[in-house]
Amino acid sequence: MNRFCKYLLFVFFFAFLSCDHSQETQVKTDPNALKQSMEKANRYMVNDEEADIEDYVNRHGLKMVSTGTGLRYVILKQGSDQLIQEGQTVSLEYELRSITGDMIYSSKNEGNKVFQVGGGTVESGLDEAMAYLHKNDIATLIIPSHLAYGLHGDDNKIPAYSTLIYTIKIIDIQ
């Protein structure tokens, strides 16, 4: 019996020690450290995306024009001299692919994309590209994620942080 009591006392002792009696301590995070950490992670993601874009351009032998925002474009076939202006309505045929080459959307399945330039209804990179294009141009655009759907994707087929590759033909401008 004595051995049983010692064993029982031993079990209760360790059970008591295993109970958490400490008060929850609040972890204070330095806002500057958090900001620096987020900036570092963002720089890494931007550099990684930039490397992927450069690799894509080199693999496909594209001679692209790069804008200050990160948009890249090449006109594959020159159309008319009629440059697209802000406020005009543009109709275009398109194929939209991921940087890995997977088809996401196309005008064959979705219909032509029609939008007002500068209206904010399409990806900002696509909107920006219109300033460099003419009626009947055929072009390839590389739109980095920050000029496309960014952090959230399109909640359908485009995942977060996706670089988009558009091949477009400007059908009409009004």
Question: At which residue positions do the language-model features occur?
Answer:
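Short, Lys/Arg-rich N-terminal segment immediately upstream of the first membrane anchor
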Residues: 1-2, 11
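Cross-family detector of peptidyl-prolyl cis-trans isomerase
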Residues: 2-6, 19-174
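Bacterial N-terminal signal peptides
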Residues: 7-16
